[in-house]
Amino acid sequence: MELEYESKRPLHIPYAGPILLEFPLLNKGSAFTEEERANFNLHGLLPEAVETIEEQAERAWRQYQEFKHDIEKHVYLRNIQDTNETLFYRLLDGHLSEMMPIIYTPTVGEACEHFSDIYRRARGLFISYPNRAHIDDMLQNATKQNVKVIVVTDGERILGLGDQGIGGMGIPIGKLSLYTACGGISPAYTLPVVLDVGTNNPQRLNDPLYMGWRHPRITDDEYYEFVDEFIQAVKRRWPNVLLQFEDFAQKNATPLLNRYRDEICSFNDDIQGTAAVALGSLIAASRAAGTQLRDQTVAFLGAGSAGCGIAEQIIAQMKSEGLSDEEARARVFMVDRFGLLTDKLPNLLDFQSKLVQKSELLANWDCNSDAISLLEVVRNAKPTILIGVSGQPGLFTEEIIREMHKHCARPIVMPLSNPTSRVEARPEDIIRWTEGAALVATGSPFSPVNYQDKVFPIAQCNNSYIFPGIGLGVLASGAKRITDGMLMAASRALADCSPLANNGEGALLPDLADIQQVSKRIALEVGKAAQLQGAAVVTSSDALQKAIEHNFWQPQYRSYKRTSF
């Protein structure tokens, strides 16, 4: 039976008694009214007091504060989510800045590593390769019937932690929690999915409590055929769904995105979402410095799908500001474990080959021509922006940062690797090495830095600024695909919200407390771009704004009326 969740009218439901209390989307706990307790056979199953959601949230907040360790707080919040989703989101709504690092990065990384140890209750769908003949049946088994947003992972590249098998399910669960908390997408319309294709992690395979398929990962044709079976089943079940690929390994992420982005409304947050939030941050930083992105030179440490995705977005923005493709690409330097990507390097991936530097342009460099290091790139190319997506801690050394500062008065340094333990440099070190001159944005949350009696806010270049607004914009506009223009619109809308760019002071990115308004602004621009590019039916801006407000779910209890199946 499909329930109508969007309006504020009374909700007619057929469930009663203990079954109703076990339904997280519908359970109100102690907030069921006397009339509802009588109508739904709840008398005796609840304490006498009828409470408001505010009173419930206050109790939950007090309980939350009793936990000393972040992983304990994560488990506690997940328990509330699996018991009473409306209360869970009301609690987040009042404490989002404190709780976002708990429900998502960095704590979700630890939760993924220990998924089988802390497992309490199933959420979402676990689609395993041994049961591949029954994918359609599995989708029919989903408790949510009108799914509008799916986040799917195969668990192979979880944050910077690598292959976690089905433990990777923690990422889709956390991501969809933020679609709701930040982007107002009703939890009734979201579905986390993990594709269990085995694992190559010996710790998981040898763990007697591991709950996934104990088998080495399937690869090549077997893997791609299985993913395709899943995609086709999703299209049959929910043809208008938004599908987000999450934490797939580099070798699979780009091919899957390229294959399906025009077949089903889909995007890869690690590639496109990371690129969009990074670009928005860089546009804002350039404005704050009184320049344009076309005037910057960018060095990357990490040339995987995420780094190359960011680079391509930067190049697109530079071109929109007047540079040719060749001029823009000459300003972007990609460094991986083998050194600077040049046209002499063999065995490059397709998406890397577009970002190589021409060897003849490096002829006058003072460097080791066989493997040009990041330090040598900084000395010779003199970048004004340094971006880390390597997943390796400490690689932005003091020597590299000080060398960058020699030729750049206001360097922009973005160590984006997650979780915190994998960050290329800590913000306090970057601030100190540049005597307070650097603009810093990180991938994980960091506290403000105090240096020489001045406080430096550290922007978290968090994809949560982008993907909830994209999702809301897609739902409100009815977009059938996500175009590059829609992603660019999201980046520019985020830059427009920068306190530093707008006021000359404050953080590079808006406060997380304002993220719902940021998401609405991004949704509007994404929806407009979808209409301009033919991905959605054209409406007026007013109609689009009304659709955004209509789709924006609030964690409030509705009254219930009893009905039969």
From Swiss-Prot:
A single Gene Ontology biological process assigned to it is: malate metabolic process
Q: List the disulfide bonds.
A: none
The enzyme's main class, written as a single word, is oxidoreductase
Cross-referenced Gene3D superfamilies: Malic enzyme, N-terminal domain, NAD(P)-binding Rossmann-like Domain
* Superkingdom of the organism of origin: Bacteria
Checking NCBIfam families in the record gives: PRK13529.1 (NF010052)
Family (UniProt): Belongs to the malic enzymes family.
**Name of the protein described by the UniProt record:** NAD-dependent malic enzyme
Gene behind the chain: maeA
